[in-house]
């Protein structure tokens, strides 16, 4: 109940500002309760400083609530993260931008803060040829983000970092709004052959990256460079 009360407070606090939170995971057809193995913040505002430690798994000015759970996930499966602005909608449609997912292998998913090296991207979507964005697809899917888990992962505990970057105000440095939550998962059934290159949070993004500081309105974008590394493939 405490997690649900915090989530409701966070959603209500950000309702006017159209912010969003990844509240829960869906694994093998089971939608877990909000905050189950997900570090939910007490406020659903964005992180705008890409050099902040909070860019890893959220945090001040949005203190997160620890979770004592780990959700088991099969390598090679596709899970979902559920995003919510309020209980009934996802994010304001004006918040155009990319949607991504990262993993970090850790010894202790419950207590690892997520900061530092070890992160690798496993999925991304950005600007489409028809001018729509990944966020548009997320809204159309009622906030459910598909996240494919690579089949070649080593078994063990991981942090899963799901992220939206809203670019409606990104024409000036510090205007991009980063929304991210970390979930605690245990991977089983992987082949163990994965050897991905990794990046650090903070560190993977710079304020002047073309995918962070960008005017998405004028001139019309012909290409958008999604921040961070290319997604890892087996």
Swiss-Prot record:
Binding site for O2: 168, 177
InterPro entries: AA9, AA9_LPMO
Cofactor note: Binds 1 copper ion per subunit.
One cellular component term from this protein's GO annotations in UniProt: extracellular region
GO terms (BP aspect): cellulose catabolic process
Free-text biotechnology note from the record: Lignocellulose is the most abundant polymeric composite on Earth and is a recalcitrant but promising renewable substrate for industrial biotechnology applications. Together with cellobiose dehydrogenases (CDHs) an enzymatic system capable of oxidative cellulose cleavage is formed, which increases the efficiency of cellulases and put LPMOs at focus of biofuel research.
Compartment(s): Secreted
Superkingdom of origin: Eukaryota
Alphabetical list of Pfam families matching this protein: AA9
Signal peptide: 1-18
Cysteine-cysteine disulfides: 57-182
Keywords on record: Carbohydrate metabolism, Cellulose degradation, Copper, Disulfide bond, Metal-binding, Monooxygenase, Oxidoreductase, Polysaccharide degradation, Secreted, Signal
Principal subcellular localisation of the protein: secreted
Annotated GO MF terms: metal ion binding; monooxygenase activity
PANTHER family cross-referenced by the UniProt entry: ENDOGLUCANASE II, PUTATIVE (AFU_ORTHOLOGUE AFUA_1G12560)-RELATED
Function in brief: Lytic polysaccharide monooxygenase (LPMO) that depolymerizes crystalline and amorphous polysaccharides via the oxidation of scissile alpha- or beta-(1-4)-glycosidic bonds, yielding C1 or C4 oxidation products. Catalysis by LPMOs requires the reduction of the active-site copper from Cu(II) to Cu(I) by a reducing agent and H(2)O(2) or O(2) as a cosubstrate.
Family from the record: Belongs to the polysaccharide monooxygenase AA9 family.
Protein name as annotated: AA9 family lytic polysaccharide monooxygenase D
Gene: LPMO9D
